[in-house]
């Protein structure tokens, strides 16, 4: 029997920080002044604070929110804090200058809904920047029948580009890279695979029993993307029907 008690997907801290640094390198070539930043997924306040020292930070995970006393103390220390912000579609949105999503999309069974929530958060002419794990992640584990499966929301990057356009984003740019992790022991590989949500129920026992079938390495397909919200949200397509927001209708002069 496996001694692992849960197979809940998460992201190892070392991986989220590594990908955040790679995203930040891509952000350096983009001209952006951000006062309000929403974190979707892993939160790296220190890293973002270096680029946007005056920005306020928000996230949808209430567990990560700093209390009012903590925020006051951090303000006195000139360090960033994070506040909770709902992504509820019924609440007023379009408040953010930047949505930063580090390794979140692949955790969603319906990733298109997450893309739509990002669009609701952003002001006109604001930036979405994200990274997620693509469908080739953990492909080495699939040689062991019944032990692993692709991550639920590991979309092909072209499908994500289409979802961005359908949700009202403009100028989407997508690229990807492969990162190969090598391990000295099967247990170390298994630990990371479980954290990433690659191992199905009872899969850990199968991998341990048949580890000689799979190499001691794991591929991460990391997909990066960014897109802008247009100056005016003129229309959106839903089920083949274009809708025009009332506040976007211009009177002819």
Task: Name these PLM-found stretches.
Residues 125-186, 196-205:
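Conserved catalytic/acceptor-binding region of the Class I
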Residues 1-11, 71, 75-76, 250-253:
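Eukaryotic N-terminal low-complexity, Ser/Thr- and Lys/Arg-rich leader segments
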Residues 49, 55, 136-140, 216:
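Terminal, non-globular segments
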Residues 24-93, 98, 112-113:
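Class I SAM-dependent methyltransferase SAM/SAH-binding core
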Residues 96-112, 116, 132:
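A short SAM/SAH-binding and catalytic strip from SAM-dependent methyltransferases
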Residues 1-34:
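Class I SAM-dependent methyltransferase Rossmann-like catalytic core
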Residues 24, 28, 167, 187-253:
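C-terminal lobe and adjacent flexible extensions of AdoMet/dcAdoMet transferase-like proteins
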Residues 112-127:
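A short glycine-rich, Lys/Arg-flanked "PGG" loop and its adjoining helix->strand segment in the class I
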């Amino acid at each position: 029997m496996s001694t692992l008690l849960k197979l809940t997907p998460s992201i190892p801290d070392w991986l989220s920080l590594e990908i955040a640094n790679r995203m930040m390198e891509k952000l350096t070539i983009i001209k952006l002044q951000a006062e309000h930043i929403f974190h979707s997924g892993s939160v790296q306040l220190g890293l973002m604070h270096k680029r946007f020292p005056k920005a306020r930070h928000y996230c949808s995970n209430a567990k990560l929110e700093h209390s009012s006393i903590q925020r006051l103390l951090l303000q006195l220390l000139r360090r960033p804090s994070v506040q909770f912000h709902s992504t509820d579609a019924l609440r007023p949105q379009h408040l953010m200058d930047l949505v930063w999503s580090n390794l979140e999309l692949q955790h969603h069974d319906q990733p298109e809904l997450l893309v739509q929530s990002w669009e609701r958060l952003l002001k006109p002419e604001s930036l979405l920047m994200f990274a997620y794990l693509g469908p080739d992640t953990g492909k080495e584990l699939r040689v062991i029948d019944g032990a692993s499966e692709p991550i639920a929301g590991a979309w092909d990057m072209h499908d994500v580009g289409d979802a961005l356009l359908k949700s009202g984003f403009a100028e989407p740019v997508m690229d990807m890279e492969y990162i190969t992790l090598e391990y000295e022991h099967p247990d170390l590989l298994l630990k990371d695979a479980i954290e990433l949500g690659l191992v199905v129920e009872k899969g850990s026992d199968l991998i341990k029993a048949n580890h000689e079938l799979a190499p001691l390495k794991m591929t991460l397909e990391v997909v990066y993307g960014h897109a802008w919200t247009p100056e005016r949200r003129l229309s959106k397509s839903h089920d083949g029907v274009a809708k025009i927001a009332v506040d976007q209708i211009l009177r002819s002069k």
